[in-house]
Amino acid sequence: MAKASITRNYRFPTLNDLYFLPGGNPALNNESGFTYETGLSFSVDKDKVYTLSGSASWFDQHINDWIIWLPTSKGFYSPVNLKKVHAYGVEVQADYAVAIDKAWKLGLNGTFAWTPSIHEGEPTSKADQSVGKQLPYIPEYSATLSGRLTYRSWGLLYKWCYYSERYTMTSNAVSYTGHLPPYLMSNVTLEKGFSLRWADLSLKGTVNNLFDEEYLSVLSRPMPGINFEFFIGITPKWGKKKK
């Protein structure tokens, strides 16, 4: 199946953008622009044994007054408008699900994105080297792989993520503080579902950053190493008729 779309974009600054202390900028302009997108998708299946689906799309986005938070000489970040930004790229996704038998099921998912986001406005000064460069903190490449194995009401999920290097400066200077190196991330989750008379109960335990990867999302702010989450979800069956 083929698809195509043209979208008119318009975004107001958030309250944080305008009034966060310190760093909010009440003088921000609204973002506006157009997004052009086209793509292909497919889906095939065999009875109830397996399903295979995938999609690939190309997008081309032209935004005026793009809002971005950048570091200041005062030691904190503040949002500014970039007059013209050209963001474009390719996004690919594939899904595969198979019933191994009546109780066991396996699902696989993969994504890949190539997303350059280029500043195409005018330089604000003679020292401004940001024009024609990738926007700070936006990776050009990213990918994910995940697998889910279920047995009746049990589920085991593994997710792997990759993010390419990100620049921290608008000039894209490659220095010790000018870029953040690429990193890999692995998370694993074990879950169990229960169906009670009055509610559906879900228990999940997750190990984030399974291999204790050292990485940064923002310069000088290390992210947690291996860490653990526990989740309990309760969905009441109020109003449902008993079978």
Language model regions located:
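Hydrophobic alpha-helix-in-membranes signature
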Residues: 12, 115, 135-138, 180-181, ...
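Hydrophobic alpha-helical packing residues
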Residues: 4, 15, 147, 240-243
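Outer-membrane beta-barrel signature, preferentially recognizing the C-terminal barrel domain
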Residues: 1, 7-63, 70-100, 135-141
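C-terminal beta-signal and adjacent terminal beta-strands/loops
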Residues: 64, 162-171, 179-181, 187-243
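Hydrophobic, well-ordered secondary-structure elements that form the walls
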Residues: 4, 38, 56, 92, ...
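Outer-membrane beta-barrel translocator domains and adjoining extracellular loop/strand segments
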Residues: 14-21, 65-74, 119-128, 159-160, ...
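Gram-negative outer-membrane beta-barrel transporters
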Residues: 50-62, 81-168, 200, 211, ...
